[in-house]
């Protein structure tokens, strides 16, 4: 693909607006145990590396995920070696939020591990971040401490959150973060409040937003889900999507580019006998 995917900035870091999701590569399907097991069986390091390579060749170099498991680490290294391009890994570690000195030391070690792997952005995972959101006081308790640890480790702090309140409270309190995650899709899958409320919240955010689960775990077709997200976020915001095959990656990239460029996507549609009546008549 000749066209490089559009980019945005997280503080002084240039990132692709399309972000590689990792749930489907790590066995998190949000569907069933059987689906999780199938993902783990099929998403080998070699297969994931093929997908990452397609992304990198199209200028999509940004990835969102936890401290990577061995097979994902290997996949990233394979793809980087083949393309000569570097993956920007936005890492979402789980922290110990107990609040005592021992817990803080454990969190600092986790953050240092993120820095050691070369992650430019560190976003405490929703399991840590959202447990600290205080709706009564409209603050994210202790997050300023974790943000300081992240800055001291040389990374940009962010928030991986499923709560729409988190970006709001971060902005209201002047929390030192460069970006935040938010679940956002046309059908409201896993969203805690209505889609229109989250849409307005995103547009009011002071920092760029990484929208996740745009296809609602395949509950909407790629064209539908991507059209909704790309057309209702700002130019500085991002869309993070999961894939399971290199061809899916190519389709996601082409559909996204076509939507941003306002043209018809050049992808081969799935075919069944019922489509024959709407096909162009052969001359």
Language model regions located:
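Active-site beta->alpha loop and helix N-cap motifs at the rims of alpha/beta catalytic domains
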Residues: 41-137
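Structured C-terminal cap/extension of enzyme domains
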Residues: 8-17, 36, 47-64, 80, ...
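N-terminal amphipathic alpha-helix/helix-capping segment at the start of soluble metabolic enzymes
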Residues: 1-34
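Short glycine-enriched, charge-decorated loop/helix-capping segments at active-site entrances
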Residues: 33-42
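Active-site-adjacent beta->alpha loops and helix N-cap segments on the catalytic face
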Residues: 68-84, 101-107, 129-146, 164-169, ...
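Glycine-enriched alpha-helix->loop->beta-strand junction motifs that scaffold or abut catalytic
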Residues: 116-120, 151-153, 172-181, 204-208, ...
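Active-site beta-loop-alpha junctions enriched in small/polar residues
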Residues: 23-25, 68, 92-98, 127-129, ...
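Hydrophobic faces of well-ordered beta-strands that scaffold small-molecule active sites
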Residues: 15-22, 62-65, 87-93, 122-124, ...
